[in-house]
Amino acid sequence: MSSPNLAHPPTDYTGIVLFPRELSQFFMGDAGETLLINGAPGTGKTLFTIRGLDVLDRDSDVLYVSTRVDQETVHEMYFADHSSLDTTAILDLFQDPFELPLDVDVPFEKLDLDSLLEWIQEINAATTQLTIAFDSWELIYEYLAVRHDDPPDIKTVTNQLAVLAREENIRLMLVTETAAPSSLEYIVDGVVTLQVKEDDRGRTRRDLRLDKLRGVRIGNRLQPFTLADGQFQVITPVELLTIQTGTGNGTWDPLANSKAKFSTGIRDLDRILSGGYNRGSVVHLDLGPDLSRDAWSVLTLPTIRNFLSQEMGVAVVPPREGSPGLLHNDLNTVLSSQVFDTYCHVFETYAGPSDSADRYDQPDSTESFSEMATTTPPDDAPTATHETDGADDGSRSTDGVTGSDQPHPIDEDFESPIEGGQLAYEPYMAYVEQVREESEDPLLHVISMDTAQEAFETRLGDFANYVALHNDLTLLITKQGTELRTRADRVADMHFRLERSGDAIILYGENPLTPLLGIGISQSESIPKITLTEMV
């Protein structure tokens, strides 16, 4: 049987992987491995086991052994529509332990603890590679133990199974009914624990803990997962685009706004919000600790693109610690430079030197939110210059609007909202009013409250009223330690939080209340597509 490389388990490239990479590597070992699957009832152990069998079925014969109910019922409850396995892969010991999909000559009539190992050996002899799961192992042990006057304890039988698995190169999965550590963990080669809990607002949070995987380096022990659509799926780390010069080859297909709503630019989020953000509303995007410095862009960039693609004005005050050139490079990749120059207004302020430990970002690398792509150091960032001879070199007049995002050129009649390197409220409002006069459409304001704290600390209420009056949309960005965080929440119509869960990124709404949503970013196309998967 030809098989794919299990080190790279199947994924749909949207931040969801069907089986953890570490577990695929664990089962690739030369010797048979025994995995203990811990978890309280209702944590998703059976769906996890079925997912594992589904993946391992690609290069082995698999068998799911249970004492639950009959084959048809088990298949209908857990396998149908969620697995490629049919009823022949399911064995109910309560019925006939010898009704196997393989041609096996079993030299005994009754299955008990003494004959269990021989039974497994006979099945293995009829296959090239066997994977067998016992769900649950305690119930199967108890069912077979009652056939003995003085049965060996479960620890002894488990040890015999693990030894047999190593000798015969059999993959074993033993499902238990407890999350508490047990003596069995010292016998087996690998241990995972499935956990589920609810937060104070009733949202379900599920995590897979990789306790032990012999021979495998575990970089991230805690991995969030979901049982959405009745399937076990791991929510994986997502990658941000490497900061680079835009090519202009992408095409952003805008999502339509309605009379009452602005599209978020993310189809899944529009669906959750019944069409998007309300017109005239203030949205608070609350960033949790330990996120990368460009995490703010995950939700804001799609909305910015959607406004600009419909030739609607956008004013952005980005975080001071964001990657230089992020907006310019991203937007010029998916929109024409004329659209960016005409409708996008970026106001960056002077941050000055800082050695603060309370930053968005972690040390740079190239992998994910937790390991960001290397960006241009501040000293090497492009400086603002005036356009000369109409040259289209990406440098435009900033007239006090400083920074490397090469903002919209300031009209001679427009007064810069930057005073002494800092954003000022009245000049900002005067500036957007002049922008508004050039268009009949509402504006999008994207404002980092850390950057704009001095300008907005006494005017947030006034600004929220202004936004409502003009049917604009505002995204206020705060992070841990932002002084205006609580005040931003008070004036906001919606409140969303972005936080880390293991190495993955989770989004959820406080107002409106939403489930936890795993974020996936597909980079298989020229424009990244963001997907949201509900954690259930």
UniProtKB/Swiss-Prot annotation:
Residues 363-372 have a biased composition (Polar residues). GO terms for molecular function: ATP binding. Induction: Transcribed divergently from the gvpA gene. Maximally transcribed in late log phase, probably part of a gvpD1-gvpE1 operon. Gas vesicles appear earlier when grown in static culture, possibly due to O(2)-limitation. Disruption phenotype: Partially gas vesicle-deficient. A double gvpD1-gvpE1 deletion is partially gas vesicle-deficient, still transcribes gvpA1. Residues 386-396 have a biased composition (Basic and acidic residues). Residues 373-385 have a biased composition (Low complexity). It is found in: Cytoplasm. It comes from the Archaea. SUPFAM superfamilies: P-loop containing nucleoside triphosphate hydrolases. This is Protein GvpD1. It comes from Halobacterium salinarum (strain ATCC 700922 / JCM 11081 / NRC-1) (Halobacterium halobium). The lineage of its organism: Archaea, Methanobacteriati, Methanobacteriota, Stenosarchaea group, Halobacteria. The gene is gvpD11.
